[in-house]
């Protein structure tokens, strides 16, 4: 989850998020390269009285400052497109979960084998136990088996919402009448938090997402227990 | 005594020929600095973390700490 005075991304908990982290580093390196160049030139320009009023054109510099930016753009585009297609791969998921956005909670349906469905409301601040996170905890978490490819189908029952979990590198709009599909694998067990990412009314900031990744046997025990309670 | 005629032309060009290579070199140094001080250490950190990562041990530690809701600590 996020922590105070955080500047960068949350630690990656999925291979896709690791790739996104490295791509961001690559793009930021190019940003620093260009910014340093421009800053130096600005300082050099303002700290001189020398001017040349009679320059009309210069083919050489025009070629340089056309070709160089084109090369830089290609250096950014190639890894970007690689990640874009990587994120689109859905390789034989072990489980399909439906996440439905409502005003103002999420509901999850695990219908591959049995009919398991539950709502996930934010735990109000006054009901938090010691150690729980304000505005991030939910009463029922979306439990998934760790290191298993999961397909998630996202939609909404009323207005636009967006299902986002930064540590997993996922953000997908929940659109009424539309099923959006994405997939993820959790690299390690743990609890990963997210928040609704599309303005959806008064309690838009108060419908968090909590994903809990546990080993398969514990996931199976949990789903059996949830089915009994239902 | 006669003085040498001062240079009166090409002053801006001379300044640019001096400063532009420094500008490009500095920007490449900044990019290389970021790459080797941030990007590569981050990649190494992730590789090191997962090289000897024991998911079962970490899961049990987290479980005993009580952070999961689907799995309670073994004492409960």
From Swiss-Prot, chain A:
Binding site for Cu cation A2: 196, 198, 200, 204
Superkingdom, natural source: Eukaryota
InterPro entries documented for this protein: CcO_II, CcO_II-like_C, CcO_II_C, Copper_CuA, Cupredoxin, Cyt_c_oxidase_su2, Cyt_c_oxidase_su2_TM_dom, Cyt_c_oxidase_su2_TM_sf
GO cellular component, one term: mitochondrial inner membrane
Sequence ranges on the Mitochondrial matrix membrane side: 46-59
GO biological process per UniProt: ATP synthesis coupled electron transport
Intrachain disulfide bonds: none
Pfam family, one: COX2_TM
Residue ranges crossing the lipid bilayer per the database entry: 15-45, 60-87
GO MF term list: copper ion binding; cytochrome-c oxidase activity
Membrane topology annotation: Multi-pass membrane protein
Mitochondrial intermembrane side: 1-14, 88-230
Location(s) in or outside the cell: Mitochondrion inner membrane
Subunit structure: Component of the cytochrome c oxidase (complex IV, CIV), a multisubunit enzyme composed of 14 subunits. The complex is composed of a catalytic core of 3 subunits MT-CO1, MT-CO2 and MT-CO3, encoded in the mitochondrial DNA, and 11 supernumerary subunits COX4I, COX5A, COX5B, COX6A, COX6B, COX6C, COX7A, COX7B, COX7C, COX8 and NDUFA4, which are encoded in the nuclear genome.
Family: Belongs to the cytochrome c oxidase subunit 2 family.
Record's protein name: Cytochrome c oxidase subunit 2
Organism annotation: Gadus morhua
